[in-house]
């Protein structure tokens, strides 16, 4: 039977929603987190949880199989093809991140920045950080709220404030005022966590999940990404920051690909 999200069940078969919710919430395969989720314009809060399912396990297996296939393919491709593959992947990732953030870009523009042909104030920081995943063997620290703020300052803060000075951070570490997330039509669909003290509290919980060795990596990074976006610690640049951190943690598991990348970018 195909897995259905609770939101789908709520709208398709509302009479089954509560029963399914409690079954999943109380399942022996469910992991609970000290994190309360409250939907926009909803009165009640609900404790966050992650229910391991057969579909999730099968999906992880498929992903790891594709990873193995990729490693085997990279063993036989010419260095020039590998270089073009890594360049194309990096360009696609930066462009996808920009598109999600609503920043118009072209593959040509980003490729020129990645290749060092031109310097772009809009993309220089994000490109430099993504290239550092391949060229720098030093570990990045994403263990504390201070680490997240320090990374954001290098990665996105300057570009964010250049685009809109009102988005400059005004709290001790994160934003002090409220922030809203809107749909393409302009409708508010979420408000970030407030006050800053609560942001710090929940982000600490989120970082603990990200670094929990007792959970599968793919589950950890997916949960981290969702909770980080829910918290929304910055006025702008939350999506690109979370996406980079996820990319970094996934890349750390692909040592062979990273080693090849370092050889190419340092050549």
Show the residue positions of the predicted features.
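FIC/Doc superfamily catalytic core
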Residues: 1-267
